[in-house]
Design a protein with these regions (language model features):
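Mid-domain alpha/beta scaffold segments of enzyme catalytic cores
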Residues: 1-122
């Protein structure tokens, strides 16, 4: 039987996890962009992060015969930093057309502010 893991944060997992997934029949994974546990304060950190999930992580999964897809977007916890949010919105198109990107967006609100609403509507 073949499986697709529709929500896995593989960037924070070891390569052993890909090996175990492949052995269990996982053939594809979708990795949603996520909050890294501390606020990103500069657009450069987003560029590094997005480059990792659309590039390196796709390569890493492929080493085990697993197709890696991802979603990208502005995290709700960081939407309230307007300078950062504007910068992220400017760079998202650079990553949106990369192979393996299947969606753009972020689900949910953090503090339900006007800034969060503004950036999620863009």
């Amino acid at each position: 039987m073949m499986f697709i893991d529709s929500h896995a944060h593989m960037l924070s997992r070891t390569t052993d996890d890909y090996e175990a997934m492949a052995a269990a029949g996982v053939v594809a994974v979708i990795e949603p962009a996520f909050w890294l546990g501390q606020p990103r304060t500069h657009v450069g950190t987003y560029i590094d992060y997005l480059a990792s999930i659309v590039g390196f992580e796709r390569f890493r999964a492929g080493q085990f015969g697993i197709r890696h897809y991802c979603t990208i977007g502005l995290n709700s916890k960081e939407a309230n930093n307007e300078e950062l949010a504007e910068g992220v919105m400017e760079i998202l198109p650079r990553f949106a057309l990369k192979e393996g990107v299947v969606a753009i967006g972020e689900i949910g609100y953090d503090e339900q502010t006007a800034l969060e609403d503004k950036y999620f509507r863009l």
